[in-house]
A protein has these predicted regions:
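Single-stranded RNA-binding regions, centering on S1/OB-family and related RNA-binding modules
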Residues: 1-125
Length: 125
């Protein structure tokens, strides 16, 4: 399984709030869109690490995958860096020391997507 990318995974069971996919990936009901999910079938979710919830998946469209360049929207900035919208609900962090130019909220910027040391999706310029 590759984090930060689409993966073909089998649906193992239905839980209270999500479907459990092979590899321990949780696919929340609200991340399924209009796709009918059947136990035993395969789905193609985008898989990412959520620090609080563990391995998560979405069947929605994301704006880029790990190993790719992507134009992402800056939704907020802080002393740490900029938070970018990848389309997964959680924002991707572009650390200040990874910025080649200063960015501000509302900008659309070109970044490379990678995994950090905790397998979370991160951005760099």
């Amino acid at each position: 399984m590759e984090y930060g990318k689409y993966n073909e995974l089998e649906v193992i069971k239905k839980d209270r709030w999500f479907y459990e996919l092979e590899g321990g990936v949780k696919l929340p009901f609200d991340a399924c869109g209009d796709i009918e999910i059947i136990i035993g079938n395969k789905v193609n979710p985008f898989v990412y690490m959520d620090v609080e919830k563990g391995l998560m998946g979405t069947l929605g469209t994301v704006f880029g995958q790990v190993g790719e360049l992507a134009y992402l929207h800056v939704v907020a900035t802080s002393d740490m860096g900029a938070f970018l919208d990848l389309g997964i609900g959680k924002h991707v962090l572009l650390l200040k020391n990874k910025m080649e130019v200063e960015v501000k909220e509302g900008d659309d910027i070109l970044v490379a997507l990678k995994l950090d040391n905790k397998n979370r999706i991160a951005a760099t310029m």
